[in-house]
């Protein structure tokens, strides 16, 4: 049986890419396809010789770095892959790649990290950001209308959806009219020993954020709150918001940029608590922090409501506002001594890689049996 694994973009290593890496472990002989590939960022995980890319890879670098330039071409790029020889297609998608066209008798399973955010949930935000006058604003609206119509059509090409959380499952039902299976993403819970050979070790305890620095992650709220609280905060991650956030931050906030896994885990192990200020469909970083016995302060929406247990593994704040987040930090600080690292670690065991592999394999076998491919 020939298997194709396909992912939206292999240009940076975030939570979705970690899931895709685990899918590769389950299907080591599968061929890999993606719309765009960055060897510098992803070559360590996916060698260039193993990757099939779309025609977008030949576009100028400035276009490839800014996806808004690529929007009109992305549906066609997804449909351009020749998958006629594959019996099983597994897409890992939060945008366009689920729209690939497989042969009629092939089984297409989509592990959906999120329906396309900017064209559905964040449509008004996206249009509001296009401050280019009436004609360009109208063009952006027409383009979004086309992309939403294409996205609905692309969802019909998927035989089976898997959602990464109840939050995502609800959105798949709402936007695509499909009933998905829920399989939580795999989280690395195994590395409990982290060697303290790291230089520049913080001399005081600190709060921690591990995140891509993009607008929807709401890191700006945390920066403003910690400016006000004057508590130590370390932020690990890279993204287009980094320079702006650094300008906002006072001396109690430190940005470390991208860091390798061993160093990230060291900071998890030694932090007071993890701060998760945005709404995400699942959110792998909070689970990683909890696997080290550290409590989490999270916004009370999205996937965090499925992973954080209030008063047991962390706390919530209710409004996307600086004062609400600051109040949450104060509460968490007062209650830190009441959290048991052992209890927190136990609570996240259900998100292990082993559990993900068992559940995913079982679902694939059932799907193939239903289709008559086994």
Which residues make up each language-model segment?
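Conserved donor-binding/catalytic core segment of Leloir-type glycosyltransferases
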Residues: 200-217, 223-234
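Short alpha-helical donor nucleotide-sugar binding micro-motif in glycosyltransferases
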Residues: 266-271, 360
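Acidic donor-binding loop of glycosyltransferase active sites
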Residues: 269-281, 294
């Amino acid at each position: 049986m020939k298997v194709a694994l396909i992912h939206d973009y292999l240009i940076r290593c975030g939570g979705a890419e970690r899931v895709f890496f685990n899918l590769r472990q389950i299907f080591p002989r599968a061929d890999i396809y993606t719309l765009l590939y960055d060897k510098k960022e992803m070559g360590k995980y996916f060698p260039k010789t193993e990757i099939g890319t779309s025609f977008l890879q030949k576009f100028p670098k400035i276009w490839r770095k800014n996806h808004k330039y690529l929007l009109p071409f992305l549906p066609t790029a997804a449909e351009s892959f020749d998958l006629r020889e594959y019996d099983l297609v597994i897409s890992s998608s939060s945008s366009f790649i689920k729209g690939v066209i497989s042969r009629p008798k092939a089984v297409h399973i989509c592990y959906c990290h999120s329906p396309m955010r900017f064209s559905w949930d964040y449509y008004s935000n996206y249009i509001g950001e296009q401050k280019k006058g009436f004609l360009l604003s109208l063009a952006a609206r027409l383009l979004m209308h086309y992309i939403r119509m294409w996205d609905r059509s692309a969802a019909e090409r998927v035989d089976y959806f898997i959602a990464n959380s109840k939050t995502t499952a609800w959105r798949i039902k709402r936007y695509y009219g499909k009933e998905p299976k829920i399989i939580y993403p795999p989280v690395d819970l195994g590395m409990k020993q982290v060697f303290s050979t790291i230089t520049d070790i913080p001399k005081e305890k600190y709060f921690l954020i591990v995140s891509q620095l993009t607008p929807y992650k709401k890191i700006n709220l945390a920066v403003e709150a910690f400016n006000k609280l004057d508590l130590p905060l370390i932020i690990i991650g890279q993204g287009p918001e980094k320079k702006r956030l650094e300008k906002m931050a006072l001396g109690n906030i430190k940005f470390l940029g991208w860091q390798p896994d061993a160093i990230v885990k060291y900071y998890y192990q030694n932090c007071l608590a993890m701060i998760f200020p945005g709404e995400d469909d699942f959110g792998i970083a909070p689970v990683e922090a909890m696997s080290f016995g550290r409590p989490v302060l999270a916004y009370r929406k999205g996937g965090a409501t499925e992973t954080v247990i209030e008063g047991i593994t962390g706390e919530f704040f209710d409004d996307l506002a600086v004062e609400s987040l600051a109040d949450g930090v104060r509460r968490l600080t007062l209650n830190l001594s009441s959290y048991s690292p052992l209890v927190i670690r136990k609570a996240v065991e259900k998100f292990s890689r082993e559990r993900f592999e068992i559940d995913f394999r079982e679902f694939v076998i059932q799907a193939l049996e239903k289709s008559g491919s086994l």
